[in-house]
């Protein structure tokens, strides 16, 4: 155990769990979505005032559903049947009006843009407070306080739909905290945050916890929570299988921890990998042109520069990690490569051919971070086959890819019924099934547990061996170390 780990494990709760008031409890709770099998089975748990409980476990185990049970979305917005008793404080949740429940429980969804109602930052935070009937002075004070807590002042004038995925996540968290709820229920709040932003989130949550805020967090990424979490509840197949302490998580062997679906509890150093342009220089005598060449690319939003003079060469068989801080322009660059956004200047060549942004749509696969808008068919199997001929060759290839990504057993399910991590893997499967030789994925491991991160890494390695060039926008140091061959940092 490292010195850093030792200092973490010496942090103890100053008040015994049993002695504190209960912020929320579930007693023998089960939930089944409409026209679907039961997702949560006979779960009982309690969260004390000022306590942080982390729900962890494999993708699709029921963590998101438990968060929805607590914040009231399960059974109302998400149609289905709830059994058992849910209490918030000393009140039965069924006795509370929806606005009363929203005042007590702040929510952060896995897809932050799905909870936005306003076009800009301040309006988004104010919206929640205004709907709870706060007077103007209180709304302004709460909005300014939330913006300050997350250092978001520079985003005040930027439309929410123009923010990076990480910036959107920060806005969603700030919005949930605006009215100062008693309990914060969050689903993968760090999935799109860079290491620095995740660490800042951890420090902010620690301060709020010290002020008495209770938290339930569904999360795979644990390092930023190790100074905050009191307990880790391992969720598997819709049940709480085991309760773990910080010491348990730190002490678990890597294989056991991965079998639980948990990422490393220690901050993972970014691997030292070569810049892709260095490899291109060494291969300058090659007869075949590179798979992808970017020269002098520039992008801006209105009068604000996003990046300029970006040049990059990617060879077939390489997996390049595109890294950088939230807001550096990684998603913008990925969308330009996929032909979804025009660059202001510069050129892009694919296998030696200069491409317009329309050409890029046909020659480069782009897998977005927001995968919910990507699916069009009623089943996983049909989605994987959507862009290819329905012949035996492609059917066999789809079967193999779905097996590799642990989706074959879900092949008849509608994509909308999948968990966040399962949707992410289906998006990757669609890219691998395409005929594109250049693949670009935006945060392909967000929402993935440790085992499924390994599954995705293996699938991308196979594609690279087949001669494809792959670029992944990512903050995931574990993933980079597992499969990437090069790193390109956008500053």
For the regions a language model picked out, list residue spans one by one.
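Helix-to-loop junction immediately C-terminal to a conserved catalytic motif
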Residues: 71, 338
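ABC ATPase NBD Q-loop/coupling interface
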Residues: 85-100, 347-360
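Conserved beta-strand-loop-alpha-helix hinge in the C-terminal portion
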Residues: 239-261, 491
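H-loop/switch region of ABC-family ATPase nucleotide-binding domains
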Residues: 219-220, 474-475
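Conserved ABC ATPase signature
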Residues: 159-163, 414-418
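Catalytic Walker B motif of ABC-type/P-loop ATPase nucleotide-binding domains
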Residues: 184-187, 439-442
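ABC ATPase C-loop
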Residues: 176-177, 431-432
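Conserved ABC ATPase "signature" region
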Residues: 137-155, 393-410
């Amino acid at each position: 155990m490292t010195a850093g780990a030792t200092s973490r494990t010496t942090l103890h709760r100053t008040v015994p769990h049993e002695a504190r008031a209960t912020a929320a409890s579930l007693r023998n709770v089960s939930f089944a979505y409409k026209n679907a099998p039961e997702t949560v089975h006979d779960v009982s748990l309690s969260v004390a005032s000022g306590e942080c409980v982390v729900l962890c476990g494999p993708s699709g185990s029921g963590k998101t559903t438990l968060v929805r049970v607590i914040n009231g979305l399960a059974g109302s917005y998400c149609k289905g049947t709830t059994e058992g008793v849910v209490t918030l404080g000393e009140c039965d949740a069924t006795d509370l009006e929806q606005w009363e429940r929203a005042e007590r429980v702040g929510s952060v969804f896995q897809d932050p843009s799905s909870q936005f109602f306003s076009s800009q930052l301040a309006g988004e935070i104010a919206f929640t407070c205004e709907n709870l009937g706060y007077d103007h002075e209180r709304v302004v004070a709460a909005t300014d306080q939330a913006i300050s807590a997350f250092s978001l002042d520079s985003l005040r004038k930027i439309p929410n739909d123009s923010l990076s995925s990480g910036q959107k996540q920060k806005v969603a968290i700030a919005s949930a905290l605006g009215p100062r709820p008693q309990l914060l229920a969050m689903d993968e709040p760090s999935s799109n945050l860079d290491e620095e932003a995740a660490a800042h989130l951890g420090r902010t949550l620690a301060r709020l916890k010290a002020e008495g805020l209770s938290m339930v967090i569904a999360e795979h990424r644990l390092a930023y929570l190790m100074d905050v979490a009191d307990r880790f509840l391992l969720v598997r197949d819709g049940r709480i299988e085991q309760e773990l302490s910080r010491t348990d998580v730190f002490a678990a062997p890597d294989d056991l921890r991965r079998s639980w679906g948990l990422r490393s509890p220690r901050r993972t150093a970014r691997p030292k990998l070569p810049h892709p342009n260095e490899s291109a220089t060494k291969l300058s005598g090659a007869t075949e042109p590179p798979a992808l060449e970017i020269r002098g690319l520039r992008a801006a939003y209105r009068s604000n520069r996003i990046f300029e003079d970006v040049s990059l060469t990617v060879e077939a068989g390489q997996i390049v990690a595109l890294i950088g801080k939230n807001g550096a322009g990684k998603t913008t660059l990925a969308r330009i490569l996929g032909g979804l956004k025009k660059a202001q200047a510069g050129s892009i060549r694919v296998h030696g051919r200069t491409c317009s942004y329309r050409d890029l749509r046909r020659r480069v696969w782009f897998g977005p971070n927001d995968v919910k808008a990507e699916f069009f068919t009623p089943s996983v199997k049909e989605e994987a086959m959507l862009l290819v001929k329905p012949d035996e060759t492609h059917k066999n290839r789809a079967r193999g890819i779905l097996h590799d990504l642990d989706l074959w057993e879900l092949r008849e399910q509608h994509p909308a019924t999948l968990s966040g991590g399962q949707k992410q893997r289906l998006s990757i499967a669609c890219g691998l099934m395409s005929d594109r030789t250049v693949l670009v994925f935006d945060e392909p491991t967000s929402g993935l547990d440790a085992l499924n991160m390994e599954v995705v890494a293996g699938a991308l390695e196979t594609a690279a061996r087949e001669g494809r060039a792959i670029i992944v926008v990512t903050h995931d140091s574990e993933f980079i170390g597992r499969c990437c061959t090069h790193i390109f940092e956008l500053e």
